[in-house]
């Protein structure tokens, strides 16, 4: 078995006959290959970010998080179809100027998302429970998705135009969510927090616990995890939306997280290249 990317190559002898668990071995082999590429970069990013953080006063750190929150809110909203421009978003969140002739729903959800993000970065980072997730959803969508905000969906959902991808059936939503949150709670450091955030993102989207708003909640989860373990936060930009969704969809179609993991880790490293 052999895998090559650029100048990097990894080989493994499996014997004269193909093992019965060949598919699992392939995944483990690929993960080993990519960990050898990612982990040194992630470690360096973490170390240099920590060193930088020690020189920044807490008041400036909070200000930096709040500034990040503006761009994070704009992009996470835009990915989901918001019509507010970046300037609209900045005017709304910095100056309190409501955009003219723009969707009231987009405006409310933008404000609520930003307020929640700022609250999170200014609060003690607690254990994430099912109630945490439901409360986040209610905070953002309480005024725009009345009757559904803060509640697990009671109907099956899929992707319009793609009947090959099915999200979690209703009876399995809560058990799978609790299993995922338990994985998060029992994190043992064997993988980096960045990879943990990616896995949580992938699994949460596959569960798809809400009728709408899953993407925004999962991207909040990603940054909550990174914040908790003192890593640089993750900004997935709207301009990269196509590649983001394509990698996620490929993993869903093949029931193999490796494709999304590759995209996510490379994207995170690229976004933090100033620390390399």
Whereabouts are the PLM-identified features?
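FIC/Doc superfamily catalytic core
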Residues: 2-212, 216-276
């Amino acid at each position: 078995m052999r895998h090559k990317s650029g100048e990097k190559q990894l080989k493994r002898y499996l014997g004269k006959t193909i093992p019965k668990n060949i598919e699992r071995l392939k995944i483990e082999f690929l993960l080993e290959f990519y960990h050898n590429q990612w982990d040194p970069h992630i470690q360096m990013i973490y170390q240099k970010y920590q060193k930088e953080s020690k020189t920044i006063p807490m008041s400036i750190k909070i200000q930096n998080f709040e500034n990040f929150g503006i761009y994070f809110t704009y992009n996470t909203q835009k990915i989901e179809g918001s019509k507010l421009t970046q300037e609209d978003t900045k005017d709304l969140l910095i100056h309190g100027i409501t955009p003219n002739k723009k969707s009231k729903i987009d405006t409310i959800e933008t404000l609520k998302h930003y307020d929640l993000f700022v609250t999170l970065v200014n609060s003690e980072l607690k254990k994430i429970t099912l109630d945490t997730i439901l409360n986040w959803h209610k905070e953002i969508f309480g005024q725009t998705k009345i009757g559904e905000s803060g509640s697990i969906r009671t109907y099956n959902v899929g992707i319009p135009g793609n009947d090959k991808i099915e999200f979690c059936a209703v009876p399995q939503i809560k058990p799978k969510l609790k299993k995922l949150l338990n994985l998060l709670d029992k994190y043992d450091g064997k993988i980096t927090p960045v990879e943990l955030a990616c896995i949580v993102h992938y699994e949460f989207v596959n569960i798809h616990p809400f009728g709408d708003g899953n993407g925004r909640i999962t991207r909040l989860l990603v940054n909550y995890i990174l914040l908790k373990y003192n890593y640089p936060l993750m900004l997935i930009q709207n301009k990269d939306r196509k590649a983001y969704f394509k990698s996620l969809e490929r993993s869903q179609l093949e029931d193999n997280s490796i494709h999304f993991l590759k995209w996510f880790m490379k994207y995170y490293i690229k976004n933090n290249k100033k620390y390399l």
